[in-house]
Structures are given as C-alpha cells and as structure tokens.
C-alpha cells in the first residue's frame, strides 16, 4: 500500500522506492499521494506489466523487491465484476510464477524478495521462489489473535540463497482484548512521536 510506503519514507530519509503496477488508476493514485507528501524525488511509480520488466530495467537493479500479489488463481473464489478489483485479487494478469521470475530478474545476487500471501498458497509460493532461483529464507505467519489460525504469511526469498528457512514466531495483530500488539505498534511507528 502506498500509505505504508509514505510512512516508511518519512522515517528513512535514505530510502528510495520504485513502484510497479499494471493498473493506470492505481499508479495515478500512488503518484498523487507521493506528490502530496513531497516524496516524488524518492518515490516513483511505473505503469508496466511486470512480465515485461526486462524491457524497462536492467537485471540486478534492486536490493529488495516487495510484493502484495493477487491471492487467488484465475477462476477461483468469488470473481468480481469490477475489472480493477479482479486484477488486484486474482492472477488474471500475472501468475505467482511470473511475479517470482520478475522479482528474481530485478534483484542483485543476494537480494531479498518479500511477499505476503494466503496460507493455502504456501507450497505454490515456495516452489515458485525456487523455480525463479530464489531460496525461501524466512517465513512468518500472521494471526489476528493468539487463538486464531493464520490468515496470511510473510516470506523472504534470497536470490541465489542456499537452502534453509528460518520459521519465525507468528506476527500477532491483536492481544486477547482486541488491542493492537506492541509489535504491531512498533511496525507502524505508533510507539514513536512523529
């Protein structure tokens, strides 16, 4: 989300980000947010099909690639009548394998690829990472509360990494009382004054 990027860029002055999206409206919205926050010198967006990254970037151009991909394979789950929503939710424009291949191309050797996905797609994700030349290195499940099943997972792959994955404790979003956890507050800088 561009709002998360804005928060991060305001806290880390040395960071620069290039965003890629296939949907012109999403790119326009993100560009407007960057302009309103005076971050256009460090936050830029490109409206391109990630399956064609080779035409727009040199291999190894980035240290880190982050992706919140469509969660569902084509023709699975509830299909939205809205084209933009359908593209954002299901792999109609690019498959998980396409996404991992693009990330691997964009990363320098040893670069990191961070992805969020649904638990039912964990095996697909690990296989797609390896097929693209990236090794899963860290895995963390995301749970709303301690007594709930994970709703998402966070995975980090390393281009050219050696086998071996570190399974980390779950990221809990809420305490038993429903309040945000201390860790979530730290992630969103809620523990610091702006």
Model-flagged regions — what are they?
Residues 23-25:
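Conserved SAM/SAH-binding beta-strand->alpha-helix loop
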Residues 16-21:
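Conserved SAM-binding motif I beta-strand of class I
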Residues 1-2:
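Short, small-residue-biased leader/transition segments that mark boundaries at the very start
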């Amino acid at each position: 989300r561009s709002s998360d990027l804005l928060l991060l860029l305001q806290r880390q002055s040395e960071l620069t980000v290039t965003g890629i999206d296939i949907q012109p409206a999403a790119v326009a919205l993100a560009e407007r947010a960057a302009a309103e926050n005076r971050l256009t010198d460090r936050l830029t967006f490109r409206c391109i099909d990630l399956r064609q990254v080779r035409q727009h970037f040199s291999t190894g151009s980035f240290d880190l690639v982050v992706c919140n991909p469509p969660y569902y394979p084509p023709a699975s789950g509830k299909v939205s009548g809205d084209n933009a929503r359908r593209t954002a939710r299901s792999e109609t424009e690019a498959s998980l394998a396409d996404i991992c291949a693009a990330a691997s191309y964009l990363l320098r050797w040893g670069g990191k690829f961070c992805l969020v996905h649904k638990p039912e797609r964990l095996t697909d994700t690990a296989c797609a990472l390896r097929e693209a030349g990236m090794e899963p290195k860290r895995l963390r499940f995301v749970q709303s509360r301690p007594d709930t099943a994970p709703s998402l997972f966070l995975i980090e792959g390393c281009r050219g990494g050696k086998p071996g994955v570190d399974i980390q404790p779950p990221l809990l979003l809420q305490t038993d009382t429903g309040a945000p956890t201390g860790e979530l507050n730290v992630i969103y800088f809620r523990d610091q004054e702006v």
